[in-house]
């Protein structure tokens, strides 16, 4: 994706040995103008699945709603929760179907199923890549350098939470369109839960 189409904000995902952590900062910007410092960019789909996104807020919300509705519909019909890969594939089809007028959002799909924890990275056209960690948005280069240096496959969820916060905070400190605190979602054997981390950046 060219720099002129680079989606704003910063989102990070980490696959731990016992779950997945997704985190995103809360600033909503229009160019270099801050519209809000309370934008929600992480969404719980069900107690086994969540997404984080970087891009246009309206498109993030639309994709989250599509995923929630389809996950619930599948669960009611089949009497079990869909797998993480199945929901990522569904989202991929939705995004690719709009390739001529795409959603301006990159997405991290994270969750836990019978196969264990999964983290799947998606671009605005729906390409799928499963990975151990990823960073999206304008602060991605800043965040991923810290992830590269500190990630371990045997990390616990608690360790992954700390690393995710550090990575997003690193982006907030240097990226002018990232900021406003951090929303964080953990998905593990105990379900999906959301936390808010307040960040004070001293410049």
From Swiss-Prot:
Which compartment or compartments is the protein found in? Cytoplasm
Which InterPro entries does the UniProt entry name for this protein?
Ntn_hydrolases_N (IPR029055), Pept_T1A_Psome_bsu_arc (IPR019983), Pept_T1A_subB (IPR000243), Proteasome_bsu_CS (IPR016050), Proteasome_sua/b (IPR001353), Proteasome_suB-type (IPR023333)
EC number(s) for this protein? 3.4.25.1
Hydrolase found in the keyword field: yes
Secretion signal span: none
UniProt keyword terms in alphabetical order: Autocatalytic cleavage, Cytoplasm, Hydrolase, Protease, Proteasome, Threonine protease, Zymogen
Q: A single Pfam family, by name?
A: Proteasome
Q: Which SUPFAM superfamilies match?
A: N-terminal nucleophile aminohydrolases (Ntn hydrolases)
UniProt-listed Gene3D superfamilies: Glutamine Phosphoribosylpyrophosphate, subunit 1, domain 1 (3.60.20.10)
Q: Which GO terms describe its molecular function?
A: threonine-type endopeptidase activity
Q: Specify the propeptide location in this chain.
A: 1-9
One GO CC term, this protein: cytoplasm
Keyword Hydrolase part of the UniProt annotation? yes
Active site annotated at which positions? 10 (nucleophile)
Q: What is its main location?
A: cytoplasm
UniProt feature coiled coil, ranges: none
Query: What's a single GO BP term from this record?
Result: proteasomal protein catabolic process
PANTHER family (alphabetical): ATP-DEPENDENT PROTEASE SUBUNIT HSLV, METALLOPROTEASE TLDD
Provide the function of this protein: Component of the proteasome core, a large protease complex with broad specificity involved in protein degradation.
Q: How does it assemble?
A: The 20S proteasome core is composed of 14 alpha and 14 beta subunits that assemble into four stacked heptameric rings, resulting in a barrel-shaped structure. The two inner rings, each composed of seven catalytic beta subunits, are sandwiched by two outer rings, each composed of seven alpha subunits. The catalytic chamber with the active sites is on the inside of the barrel. Has a gated structure, the ends of the cylinder being occluded by the N-termini of the alpha-subunits. Is capped at one or both ends by the proteasome regulatory ATPase, PAN.
Q: What is this protein called?
A: Proteasome subunit beta 2
Gene that this sequence comes from: psmB2
